[in-house]
């Protein structure tokens, strides 16, 4: 199964306005990088987000959010948001801003 290209197109519309972003196909999906660090992407029909441990724990209490688990073992600091959780661009942009905020705390690669 491929990744949801519609979610990816919506992400690109938002992050293409940001500086220092890049995209890579990985893990059967697509990942987006900020200053060389992965911060979001699309896996199957999920938005994946790197929020850090504290940010991901806070996000897990929200509807349509679960731990990122694509290998059978949850990945700390990452979450997956179901498509129902990003039905409009404002919701998507808010999630991307959270991931961007965390990515900016990481050293550039």
Task: Please state what every model-predicted region is.
Residues 1-109:
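Charge-dense, helix-prone N-terminal extensions
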């Amino acid at each position: 199964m491929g990744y949801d290209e519609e979610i990816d197109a919506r992400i690109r519309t938002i992050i293409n306005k940001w500086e220092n972003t890049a995209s890579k196909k990985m893990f059967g999906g697509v990942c987006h990088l900020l200053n060389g660090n992965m911060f979001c992407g699309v896996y199957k029909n999920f938005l994946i987000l790197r929020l850090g441990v504290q940010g991901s724990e806070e996000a897990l209490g929200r509807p349509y959010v679960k731990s990122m688990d694509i290998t059978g073992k949850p990945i700390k600091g990452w979450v997956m948001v179901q498509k129902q959780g990003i039905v409009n661009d404002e919701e998507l942009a808010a999630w991307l801003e959270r991931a961007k905020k965390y990515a900016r705390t990481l050293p550039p690669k």
